[in-house]
Amino acid sequence: MAVPKRRTSKTRKNKRRTHFKISVPGMTECPNCGEYKLSHRVCKNCGSYKGEDVVSK
């Protein structure tokens, strides 16, 4: 079995993980009510998607 010869230091470990991060979700403004919502999803505030009322409130 493969076993590491030396312990991985904190610096080396953190340098390897520099690209391992969470990206910010794409938020857009709803054209109906002006609230911020996730792209390509129904607005939680007014229930519209692409200018049409999808969810009745």
Swiss-Prot record:
GO biological process, one term: translation
GO cellular component, one term: large ribosomal subunit
Homology family: Belongs to the bacterial ribosomal protein bL32 family.
Name assigned to this protein: Large ribosomal subunit protein bL32
InterPro entries: Ribosomal_bL32, Ribosomal_bL32_bact, Ribosomal_zn-bd
Record bears the keyword Ribosomal protein: yes
NCBIfam families assigned: rpmF_bact
Organism whose genome encodes this protein: Staphylococcus saprophyticus subsp. saprophyticus (strain ATCC 15305 / DSM 20229 / NCIMB 8711 / NCTC 7292 / S-41)
Keywords recorded for this protein, A-Z: Ribonucleoprotein, Ribosomal protein
Annotated SUPFAM superfamilies: Zn-binding ribosomal proteins
Ribosomal protein listed as a keyword: yes
One term of GO molecular function: structural constituent of ribosome
PANTHER family (UniProt xref): 50S RIBOSOMAL PROTEIN L32 (PTHR35534), LARGE RIBOSOMAL SUBUNIT PROTEIN BL32 (PTHR35534:SF2)
Source organism, top-level taxon: Bacteria
